């Protein structure tokens, strides 16, 4: 990476002064459980002609996951913390790129890549329930905290 990810900040003041997000990722599901779950991408730019609308969609392989408290692979505050590149000038390739999306009912965690097009995230990996239980001793992932 030739430059620091512009969505990573050295202080809360810098984060508050940054431009607002242009899109938002929102869990989408069928309450009846007949259709597959998805991650909807919403346009949050008030000056956009598609403001408030769904501008992207990533369908998951199954229904009934109950997606819950998902987050990024790297916190926007990563540069504030010792050892994360904020103090020694080495950013170690930090980039807010992957969404980690847990399903509290399925116990699966989906990894979605938001590059090269943030409006079209793609599932790159699924951490299956049995892998989570075997390797970490956990089930029912509730909240994913970043990096």
Give residue spans per PLM region:
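A short beta-strand motif characteristic of beta-propeller blades
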Residues: 4-5, 55-62, 125-135
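Repetitive beta-architecture junctions, highlighting loop-to-beta-strand starts
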Residues: 22, 37, 53, 97, ...
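Asp-box/WD-like beta-propeller blade repeats and closely related beta-sheet repeat scaffolds
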Residues: 114-147
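Structural signature of eukaryotic scaffold interfaces centered on beta-propeller domains
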Residues: 1-20, 66-95, 137-147
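Short loop/turn segments immediately following beta-strands, especially the blade-tip
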Residues: 41-50, 111-122
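Short loop/turn segments immediately following the C-termini of beta-strands
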Residues: 29-31, 102-105, 114
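General structural concept
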Residues: 40-45, 50-80, 97
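Sequence/structural signature of beta-propeller modules
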Residues: 1-47
């Amino acid at each position: 990476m030739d430059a620091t990810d512009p969505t990573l900040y050295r202080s809360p003041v810098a984060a508050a002064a940054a431009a607002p997000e242009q899109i938002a990722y929102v869990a989408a599901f069928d309450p009846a459980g007949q259709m597959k779950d998805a991650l909807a991408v919403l346009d949050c730019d008030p000056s956009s002609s598609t403001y408030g609308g769904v501008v992207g969609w990533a369908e998951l392989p199954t229904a009934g996951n109950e997606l819950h408290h998902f987050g990024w692979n790297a916190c926007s505050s990563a540069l504030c913390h010792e050892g994360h590149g904020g103090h020694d000038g080495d950013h170690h390739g930090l980039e807010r790129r992957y969404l980690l999306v847990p399903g509290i009912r399925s116990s699966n965690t989906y990894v979605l890549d938001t590059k090269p097009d943030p409006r079209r995230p793609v599932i790159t990996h699924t951490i299956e329930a049995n892998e989570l239980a075997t390797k970490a001793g956990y089930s029912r992932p509730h909240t994913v905290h970043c990096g």
